[in-house]
């Protein structure tokens, strides 16, 4: 099997992901996943979730680059990218990932600020008199 490329997105974060058969090494922005996360186990579980669902955690090598957003958004973009790459590799993986919602792009983004208001929805204090 050759290397499969996919992109994942979340908020303003973008992850470019290359997945190939291997020994289970995950490299993000040139460093190991654990180093990149700095010991955040909850976020690590989020990133490797597609591999756990498809039972491929020790048989796929992943190389990824992320940009934009924060750590959490980048991790979710990475999860989305890994899911899409696995689905492109094998149709059986798609059948496992789809019901878990891992192939769905989370479209929630920051609401824009409107004029005449302080923030997106917060308006100036109203005084009757």
Swiss-Prot record:
Region: Disordered, residue numbers: 107-129
Keyword Ribonucleoprotein: yes
Cellular component GO terms, alphabetical: cytosolic small ribosomal subunit
Coiled coil: none
Disulfide bonds: none
Bias (Basic residues) ranges: 114-129
Classification via SUPFAM superfamilies: Ribosomal protein S5 domain 2-like
Superkingdom in the source lineage: Bacteria
Keywords from the named record: Ribonucleoprotein, Ribosomal protein
Gene Ontology molecular function: RNA binding; structural constituent of ribosome
Ribonucleoprotein found in the keyword field: yes
InterPro entries associated with the record: Ribosomal_Su5_D2-typ_SF, Ribosomal_uS9, Ribosomal_uS9_bac/plastid, Ribosomal_uS9_CS, Ribsml_uS5_D2-typ_fold_subgr
Gene3D superfamilies according to UniProt: 3.30.230.10
GO biological process, one term: translation
Entry similarity comment: Belongs to the universal ribosomal protein uS9 family.
Cross-referenced PANTHER family: RIBOSOMAL PROTEIN S9, SMALL RIBOSOMAL SUBUNIT PROTEIN US9M
Name under which the protein is recorded: Small ribosomal subunit protein uS9
